[in-house]
Amino acid sequence: MCGIAGIISFQKNLTEEELIRMRDSMIHRGPDGSGLWISENKKVILGHRRLSILDLSEKANQPMSNEDGSLQIVFNGEIFNYQDIRLELEKRGHIFKTDHSDTEVIIHSYEEWGFSCVEKFRGMFAFAIWDNNKNLLWIVRDRIGIKPIYWTKCNNKFLFASEIKALFSNPEIKKEVNTQSISDFLSILTVPAPRTMFKNINKLKAGNMMIINDKGDIKIEKYWDIATFLNNPINDITETEAIKETEKIINNAVKLRLISDVPLGITFSGGVDSTLITAFMKKNNINDIKALTIDYNIKSKYSEIEVARKISKQIGFNLQEKTINENDFALGIEEYTNIQNDYPAGDPNTILMYLISKRVKELGLTVILVGEGGDEIGGYPYYLKINDEFKYLNLFNSLPQFLKNSLYNISPLKAKKFLGFGIGDTVISRTHINGFTEEEKNKILLENSYDSSYNIISKLMNEITTEGKDLFLRKVLNVEYKNRLPQLILPRVDYPTMANSIEARVPFLDHKLVEFSARLPFNIKMKDREAKYILKNILSNYISKDLLYRKKVGFGMLLTNFLNFTVPKWIQNELLNKTNNPIYYFINKNSINKLMYLHTKKLCYGYKLWILYSLKKFLDYHIVDN
């Protein structure tokens, strides 16, 4: 895991100092070393910050070249099946200078297979290869979007980096907040790629590659699409076959992600996902499992620390526990936002992951396995709920207009809240509107000339056209994989872990598992309306039924409970601060006062207040440059 950056100039010569500023703004992503390469004509420069995970030798440093120096690569991530690919390349006559660097495997793969080599890679990655013979730069992002990559063009230059802050370290890049992105953030807690929170700063979409030539022409292509698999369901598979194949792929995915030359562990919540990963770690002979769980220093029915302890005894591993309180959380916000400020921390679990990874670092670990992606693979409980809602919304849309009006008149508030997610002939999943609805935004935003954030969801849902009773859920999964995961869930893993120089690996987002699961029918994945039916069936071989079939709340439920019923004074004070408060450039201050008032009436507006608070912290950092 590392930080990468680069510049191509189409006119003036480049200096090393330009790249060093970008590279070293991301020192947290790679504290173990740094490298730089500049072309003979001074028109191309690449930089790298290294976090040493595989092949700790100096020979594995980056930027790395091929044998004749015609190719240069900078790479962030891991290719977990690099050993198999290396064997194939060696049989084809390739000679390697490193002992076991996956970076060198990428560059030789490009030599052998060109752009199609990416189809062989099983892992998480964002890399850039400069091909001196063809005078082009090739940038690739992994299929699911686990690793980020950003780019911009300015003053006859093309710049890219692992983080937006690296781009802004170049004084030529103007920082201007994108107000449409603020509107989208308020609804979906993120911004759909290729947009970011800033004008003219772009994020390469997951499963995409881009080619930039020495004239400045840019070509972006999609090399992988989850919709291909969602639109091609397997209808003739049995339950036994589905369970057996899922178990086989998960076991292999975990096994591959145990390859490391540095200590590794796992974040453990006691839920199905992290428990299953831990069980397979044990199965693959990791006997000294270092697992970390977290608890809150508040009295709550949502605490699952006792459950986590029982599971650790049944599987057989030592559980490291960390308890945090309100002050820890407040301090974590300040520490995190001083390191990472590309996006607002709209999901408070971002801060939780920062605190967890900080403790992971204290334990001497460099790599952790995490359970993200298990919900999408297994079938999350709310999928059942939104599938039911889909039926009701479709029924509502089919009614004559006078009946629709009658329903609105009977209970206008509830009707608007629920039925507002039927847009013309299209019904969207309201579960993807985690924040403010369009109607709510119209009341709080000072300007209302933004495109509806619902259109983002609607467009993605319309990509799925397969027939059958699973249609709506397949549409929902397309949104999950193309928006919620790469733009919200995975950044809340990558950013806070990398802020502590920790590499997070995501076994449930192994693309082979994602592809297979996406094609499975939901009557098997969620048989008898049991969420994660297949995963629980597999896990039943490792833990007792009373622990397996309990109601799961997860790390985040305690945090939601914490926000809804306490809303710390520091959140209130910052939002209501009238002195140079940048949020008032966009949000009506009276609406914030109203939310505060409603929250005091026990109406649970804590999460929405957090969204506004995180936006305020983001604007505090950036608005000075507008």
Feature annotation, model-predicted:
Residues F396-F418:
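Alpha-helical "lid/cap" subdomains adjacent to substrate-binding clefts that gate access
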Residues E334-N338, Y383-I386, F562-N564:
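Short low-complexity, flexible loop/linker segments enriched in glycine and/or proline
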Residues A330-N349, L445, S449, L460:
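Mobile, glycine- and charge-enriched loop segments
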